[in-house]
């Protein structure tokens, strides 16, 4: 016991030679597949039981080899797993002075001084808009908005009365003690000792910065001091902070910070823990945390220099509503004076008598002539107008849209043809004054043409009756005049009403019946429907 057999090296150091296959058959290693130690005997194959260790140990569980997975020549004897030592598949820590494990698959070798599992590194990059100081973590709430302005070099307006910042400073704080009291304030410091000027579309340095300007450079949050739970409950906003260039400002000194124009500044957030009984003015470096965000740098100006910054302010600042309204009102007045474009069912020209002169630019089916008996009507696609009877002949459409008829006076001019192919400018057509009516009116129409009724002979002379316009509808003549003998020329020829016997004299005889007798009135009443 304790003597290592010759030809067998230490397995831990990797010096054990591979067993030779000479003189060994396939069944020679069957006795080595499983190892059964004798009671009270130690495992001779475990090199850790050698005399070099000097300490005995008790045997553990056996780990047999997987049957049938390897050939006999490649089967290694099993090794007992001892409590307190790594089992199969586990690794020993690297020995002292070793270089650790070699790099594998492109991964560098770990630092041996850091052990097998090195701890986290503290120099990792923080995400944008987040700063850490000790246990406190502060995030810039409107980081994305500040980044947009920072791409074009943020500008802040300063005035005598003071102007609020936009974007304003807003932070989210974490890591404070809920019951401790903290004081928060913002100060503004110079970024460099240069004077800036906007030239050729960019900001360039020109000369040295002016001397320190007297005035307030500190703005304390109105809620200070307060508990940590109060500060962490919601965002800490400095929206009431104002910037001014008035050196002798005496009003609202605590709400304004005095700056110089054309200088670059950097705002900073200070969080100071206030102890009980300690004055607010007293602060030490041990309980003060300062947070700086590079994207909040700005150049103080009295008027915006970069047009990109001006547009960003108008688009994102809710207080710039007046700028947007003035800009939009310049075009709103023009839009209101111009009528909206007509719809597809609206005719652009209102003068129907001159429609044939435009080569039928806006044709409308069944406009001047009645529709075919079997043709369906599209009540939506046809336009509707309310005009004189000589301009329209589709009374059914008015009834469909529930419009009341109204008689409008007809303007003098050429009449509209009611037949297909009729040309107003035909030679000899002239400009007739009397309207033309279709041979047969629609029985369902709401309008009935009016014709002239004879007047009382005692009310006026025949010349006045002949010159008076037609006001009464045409009815079947009692006795037609001799001039109306040509009835075969057309049904559309007008016929004059004469209740008296035909004669060459237009004056009525003394014994002629009155047109207002009962017999005469009955024939007029038969014309009108009940």
From Swiss-Prot:
Protein's job: Lineage-defining transcription factor which initiates Th1 lineage development from naive Th precursor cells both by activating Th1 genetic programs and by repressing the opposing Th2 and Th17 genetic programs. Activates transcription of a set of genes important for Th1 cell function, including those encoding IFN-gamma and the chemokine receptor CXCR3.
Tissue spec. comment: T-cell specific. Expressed in regulatory T (TReg) cells.
Mutagenesis / variant outcome for changing residue 208 to R: No effect on DNA-binding or its nuclear localization
Protein name: T-box transcription factor TBX21
DNA-binding region: 140-325
Residues that bear Phosphotyrosine: 76, 117, 219, 265, 304, 525
Region (Disordered) residue spans: 1-55, 444-530
InterPro entries, A to Z: p53-like_TF_DNA-bd_sf, T-box_DNA-bd, T-box_sf, TF_T-box, TF_T-box_CS
Outcome of mutating residue 310 to A: No loss of phospshorylation
Post-translational modification: Phosphorylations at Ser-52, Tyr-76, Ser-224 and Ser-508 are regulated by mTORC1. Phosphorylation at Tyr-525 is essential for its interaction GATA3. Phosphorylation at Tyr-219, Tyr-265 and Tyr-304 enhances its transcriptional activator activity. Phosphorylation at Thr-302 is required for its interaction with NFATC2.
Molecular function terms from GO: DNA binding; DNA-binding transcription activator activity, RNA polymerase II-specific; DNA-binding transcription repressor activity, RNA polymerase II-specific; RNA polymerase II cis-regulatory region sequence-specific DNA binding
UniProt keyword list: Activator, DNA-binding, Isopeptide bond, Nucleus, Phosphoprotein, Repressor, Transcription, Transcription regulation, Ubl conjugation
Residue numbers carrying Phosphothreonine: 55, 302
Comp. bias intervals (Low complexity): 498-515
CC per GO annotation: neuronal cell body; nucleus
Cross-link position per record: Glycyl lysine isopeptide (Lys-Gly) (interchain with G-Cter in ubiquitin): 313
Modified residues (Phosphoserine): 52, 224, 508
Bias (Polar residues) ranges: 462-482
Domain of life: Eukaryota
Subunit structure: Interacts with RUNX1 and RUNX3. Interacts with ITK. The phosphorylated form (at Tyr-525) interacts with GATA3. Interacts with ABL1. Interacts with RELA. The phosphorylated form (at Thr-302) interacts with NFATC2. Interacts with KDM6B. Interacts with SMARCA4 in a KDM6B-dependent manner. Interacts with CCTN1 and CDK9. Interacts with USP10.
Compartments where located: Nucleus
